[in-house]
Amino acid sequence: MKECVPVKTFESLFAELTERAATRPEGSGTVAALDAGVHAQGKKVIEEAGEVWIAAEYQSDEQLAEEISQLLYWTQVLMVGRGLTLEDVYRHL
């Protein structure tokens, strides 16, 4: 596996999403996702989880990694939408 420098880490993504929720920049897809509510966010989590499974079964590692990144994004959007912190989740790991 080749080494790469991450553009974002799990923690930095969460910080970015939390900041966008607070500052609500115009035209932000994250703000739109948060405004759509927990039901819509949950549907995206389920959709992305299914795409992760399909990618794991039938697609390349690169495609799988991309699908996992989208699942992590939508999971964090849902967390922010519900007011959870990383620490709330880390307590259960």
From Swiss-Prot:
It comes from the Bacteria. Belongs to the PRA-PH family. One of its GO terms (biological process) is L-histidine biosynthetic process. The gene is hisE. Keywords: Amino-acid biosynthesis, ATP-binding, Cytoplasm, Histidine biosynthesis, Hydrolase, Nucleotide-binding. This is Phosphoribosyl-ATP pyrophosphatase. It catalyses: 1-(5-phospho-beta-D-ribosyl)-ATP + H2O = 1-(5-phospho-beta-D-ribosyl)-5'-AMP + diphosphate + H(+). GO terms for cellular component: cytoplasm. SUPFAM superfamilies: all-alpha NTP pyrophosphatases. It is found in: Cytoplasm. InterPro entries: HisE, PRib-ATP_PPHydrolase-like. The lineage of its organism: Bacteria, Bacillati, Actinomycetota, Actinomycetes, Mycobacteriales. Pathway: Amino-acid biosynthesis; L-histidine biosynthesis; L-histidine from 5-phospho-alpha-D-ribose 1-diphosphate: step 2/9. Its main location: cytoplasm. The keyword Hydrolase applies. The keyword Aminoacyl-tRNA synthetase does not apply. Coiled coil: none annotated. Pfam families: PRA-PH. GO terms for molecular function: ATP binding; phosphoribosyl-ATP diphosphatase activity. Its EC number is 3.6.1.31.
